[in-house]
């Protein structure tokens, strides 16, 4: 399966592999955060973010 798990449009039903890159993943089944310091469901993750540390929240999710 495509590791980026890209769908034609957001909300399209499909299955993501555990290795999907959620920054680009538009699948509803993908529940992972976009990066290690962002909580699942971070609304701004699609804009991209840079994590300073695994346990530190990035500015986009603050």
UniProtKB/Swiss-Prot annotation:
Residue positions binding a divalent metal cation 5: 35, 37-38, 51
Modified sites of kind Phosphoserine: 59
GO cellular component: cytoplasm; nucleus
Entry's Gene Ontology BP terms: cellular response to cadmium ion; cellular response to copper ion; cellular response to vascular endothelial growth factor stimulus; cellular response to zinc ion; detoxification of copper ion; intracellular zinc ion homeostasis; monocyte activation; monocyte differentiation
Keyword Nucleotide-binding: no
Binding positions for a divalent metal cation 4 per the UniProt entry: 34-35, 45, 49
GO molecular function: metal ion binding; zinc ion binding
Protein name (Swiss-Prot/TrEMBL): Metallothionein-1G
Gene this protein is translated from: MT1G
